[in-house]
From Swiss-Prot:
Residues 89-110 are annotated as: Cys-rich copper-binding 3. The lineage of its organism: Eukaryota, Fungi, Dikarya, Basidiomycota, Agaricomycotina. Residues 143-156 are annotated as: Spacer B4. Belongs to the metallothionein superfamily. Residues 1-35 are annotated as: Cys-rich copper-binding 1. This is Copper metallothionein 2. Copper metallothionein that protects the cell against copper toxicity by tightly chelating copper ions. Required for antioxidant-mediated growth rescue in the presence of fluconazole. Acts as a critical factors for lung colonization and virulence. The gene is CMT2. Residues 111-120 are annotated as: Spacer B3. GO terms for cellular component: cell cortex.
Length: 183
């Protein structure tokens, strides 16, 4: 059987098993990820159908296996090579793919959120992720708030909502719950 240098080209590719056997995709025209020759043809171009053909924005065209995505640009949740990190923790629908710089986590389910510390204790919805400088804690649920060294606390006993972290000079305590109230 003679080799046919110009195999049948079709954009539908997958309509029948016979079409699949003869299918090669012209550049930029591959629409079916099951086309057996979609990635075996040098001229197939950005076919988005298999291992050799990558897409930069993770549109995936129905085939997550073919997709690689730059950070923050994944559009399909099922893409197995989804961006390993996004800078704003939008997470793209997959918390497992997200890491966040300090103070920039927007999704509570981000698994790496607790590893990132914020300096102002706004906590971004997750008290477990927060460390606060003396006198700068504004969220009472911050676990690092009560651990601050009393010597570093303000002397007017503002207490920022948590009395246990405050020390006050005699006659200057403003909060009754302060355990260190003037002795």
């Amino acid at each position: 059987m003679a080799f046919n240098p110009n195999p049948e080209k079709t954009t539908s590719c997958c309509s029948t098993s016979k079409a699949q056997d003869k299918c090669t995709c012209p550049k930029g025209k591959c629409e079916c990820e099951t086309c057996p020759k979609s990635t075996k043809t040098p001229g197939s171009g950005p076919c988005n159908c298999g291992v050799k053909e990558k897409v930069s924005t993770c549109g995936c065209n129905g085939s997550g296996a073919a997709c690689t995505c730059p950070p923050g640009q994944c559009a399909c949740d099922s893409c197995p090579r989804k961006a390993k990190s996004v800078s704003t923790c939008g997470c793209g629908g997959s918390a497992a793919a997200c890491s966040c710089p300090p103070g920039k986590c927007a999704c509570d389910s981000c698994p790496k959120q607790a590893q990132e510390k914020v300096s102002s204790c706004a906590c971004n919805g997750s008290g477990g992720a927060c460390t606060c400088p003396p006198g700068k804690c504004s969220c009472s649920g911050c676990p690092a708030q009560a651990k601050e060294n009393p010597a570093d606390q303000p002397t007017t006993c503002g207490c920022q909502g948590v009395g246990v972290a405050c020390t006050c000079p005699p006659g200057q305590c403003a909060c009754d719950g302060c355990p260190a109230k003037a002795k």
